Amino acid sequence: MSSMVTPQHADELSTGARQLGVELSPTQHQLLLGYLALLIKWNKAYNLTAVRDPDEMVSRHLLDSLSVMSFIENGCWLDVGSGGGMPGIPLAILFPESQVTCLDSNGKKTRFLTQVKLELKLENLQVIHSRVEAFTPEQPFNGIISRAFSSMENFTSWTRHLGDRDTRWLAMKGVHPSDELLALPADFHLDSEHALAVPGCQGQRHLLILRRTA
């Protein structure tokens, strides 16, 4: 374990995952801690996240990402505006049978994500440096997820070409975005919404699942 990652971080991750109903294998636990160590190290130079305190990263990044894993199914997933890799990296770790693509337009962030892929040997992870509007996949994704990426109107409009009627769009939000839902494009509808409780995190968390109607 990296000296930057403490036994307290390891315990917080284990306890928080159990509270979320997420069963981590020993390998997954170690991979998540390895990711945390890389995030702490690279954040100093690359400004990957506004969260500077490593003691806050377990709850605000790892556990926040794990809070949506019960809504994920195996398949091909896209994390849009992945930034420092949340929730795409945890998704790739917990679903090794899935193909996960992390996309970001910031070159520093995609270089970091590529380093994570290499160091953690995440063979099911693809990193793409591109604007989302310019990205064209070989086939539609089964799921498209974003965390603090943009408004839901932009999220759906910019990624419409990346999915089809079978695709689920998952938007991770803080306060319930009632106004944003009113501005959804006409060909999208709200499939379900879920209030999330993230161990160690104050404030509201919501997951909104969307589908295309056409």
Curated annotation (Swiss-Prot):
Catalytic activity: guanosine(527) in 16S rRNA + S-adenosyl-L-methionine = N(7)-methylguanosine(527) in 16S rRNA + S-adenosyl-L-homocysteine
Keyword Cell wall biogenesis/degradation (UniProt): no
EC number: 2.1.1.170
GO molecular function, one term: rRNA (guanine-N7-)-methyltransferase activity
Record's GO cellular component terms: cytosol
This protein's UniProt keywords: Cytoplasm, Methyltransferase, rRNA processing, S-adenosyl-L-methionine, Transferase
Primary localization class, coarse: cytoplasm
Pfam families: GidB
InterPro entries noted in UniProt: rRNA_ssu_MeTfrase_G, SAM-dependent_MTases_sf
Residues reported in the UniProt entry to bind S-adenosyl-L-methionine: G81, M86, V132, E133, R147
Keyword Cell cycle included in the entry's annotation: no
Compartment list: Cytoplasm
NCBIfam families xref list: rsmG_gidB
Role: Specifically methylates the N7 position of guanine in position 527 of 16S rRNA.
Similarity remark: Belongs to the methyltransferase superfamily. RNA methyltransferase RsmG family.
Descriptive protein name: Ribosomal RNA small subunit methyltransferase G
Organism encoding this protein: Pseudomonas fluorescens (strain ATCC BAA-477 / NRRL B-23932 / Pf-5)
Gene: rsmG
